[in-house]
Amino acid sequence: MNVLAIGCHPDDVEIACAGTLSKCVKRGDKVVVAHLCNGSLGHVVIPPEELIPMRANEAREAGKLAGIEVIGGVFDDLDIYSDNAESRNKVVELIQYAQPDFIITHNPDDYMPDHTATAKLVFDAAFTATLPNWPSKTKKAAKLVPIYYMDTLAGV
């Protein structure tokens, strides 16, 4: 199976569903993790220009250890919008690239605006990615797949 986990920030997917993704890797699945934002505002002391490469490197190294392909953030923190065609197109291209059998992303009722925007973008892009005539760089339509929400806030 091909598994695509799309989180907003570097560490969101890793915190919320690393165990699930580890099981997927162990059974032989191809797992791709995509962070939509670069984590630029994720620290109160370290400035964005230092933090962005640090978090990207941490994500890459974690991916190597886990046998997971990691795709880095394309937006700054709090600069991701679910009603923006450019944002949706970037997520469509991620989905078409990964050709997933299922997608994991944030709960649409999350507390953080970046997370809810990510959930909405993934939901909308998952359908758009199936359209064979959609003008994307990949030019490879994906199939319509289930979307599962990761949520550590509501409890298990």
Label for each model-derived stretch:
Residues 1-6, 82-156:
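Metal-dependent de-N-acetylase/amidase catalytic core
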Residues 1-98:
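Active-site rim/loop-helix segments in enzyme catalytic domains that contact anionic ligands
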